Amino acid sequence: FDISLCDGFGAKREMITAKFKAYATSSSTLPSLNWYIQKKSKTKPAENLFILGGGIAGCTTAVALKKRGFNVSIIDRHGEVGKEASANSRAVIYPKLSTESGSLAEFNLIALKLATNYYREFWANDLGEQCGVLLLPTSDKENEEFSKLQTKHQCNDKFFELVNLKQIQKLSGIKLDIAHGLFFPTLGWLSIPEVCKFITKKYDIPIISKDATGISLVKRDNSWDVFDENDTVIVNAKKLIIANSYEVQNLKPTSYLSLKKLRGQVTEFCSNQESEKLKCVICGDGYLTPSINGIHACGATYNHNDLSESINELDHRANFGKLISTDLKFKNLIHNIDSTDISGWVGFRGTTRDYLPFAGPVPNFDEMKEKFSYLRLDAKKASDDIGSYFPNLYVNSGMGSRGLSYAPFCAEIIAAEISNQIPFIPKQIRLDIHPARFIIRDLKKKRI
């Protein structure tokens, strides 16, 4: 500050004034891009908002907006929530932590903690069980990382703890050979369909039974018409949030989003005397839930280039194989299983190139590509140019197999942006899950 003494105000003889000296930072030492910034529009809480997709992403987003005073409706072709990849009735909140520093590790930790608090209400209403999740290492490298994680997250000692063989057997209730693991006492499993039904009923969110196959911008008021397969307008949305997983690519404004349709099969099998002793979820190469009404669930497969909706016997074997590769003692839990006691279900995840979700405003691909074309020549060039985005259009998708972990976090991000609230996360995390991130990256690498 530049401080000076001048004539005082009123009866005061003198007073001190100060003027802030803004030091301009050289753009060559601190490159800056504002591609993530969009022009803000005035939002009235009473406006009707519509969400495409009634899975965990769409339902949590609807609730986050309803809590902020918006009128929200969900459009889903099934006419009910908790379908498609969100039809998993024994879904695990899978912990994913890293010994590395940076925004990715921070994002996973923040999202996981937010999810833990978010789902307490559902566990209290018997929509799952907060039985704890035991994470077992699948390699010597992971075993070493577990010790490093314990050191790195000492301030999070109540969130998880490093446990030895004796503790593992006590916590899990079964005999295992593995020497160490990480135990997350506040995590567990949930029935995603029941969670979706519970929150949409509690917050009185209407479900419109229509198959939305197209959207179009109404330029006179920047609203969006939503069409069915007959090109009939279903609704006119003042604001529209697309939350239909990999199917975002079927809509023209979001067709550029790089989302892969990835098949996953879950195996369900009848419990036996030994497996009934399992008290918590165990995660390693795959996962295994405790007996729920005499049924265990384990999984899940990651089938690339396989779009079959039929249950595959080979995938059941693969899921059992994942358990045994984690610890040979799992053989005691799955031996002598009759094929008639095995069932399962198939779902299709929507995954991104970097395995992080898309959450935020939908960029105008052509305008962004033109506006930031200079990045092809100089990837480090700084600019004050803000991004080009479609008005009143948002996307929440690409959570892969971590829908339960990421959904509450992404829902809050989108609801905050629509409400013109300040984001509650570090800037770099916001950029890492921003829908425009691949446009900027691909321009810098001359891919587009």
Each PLM stretch: what is its role?
Residues R90-S172:
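Dinucleotide-binding Rossmann-like beta1-alpha1 core, especially the glycine-rich loop
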Residues I208-W224:
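A conserved short coil-to-beta-strand element within the FAD-binding core of flavoproteins
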Residues L97, E274-D385, Y389-P391:
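Active-site lid/adjacent beta-loop-alpha segment flanking the redox-cofactor pocket in flavoenzymes
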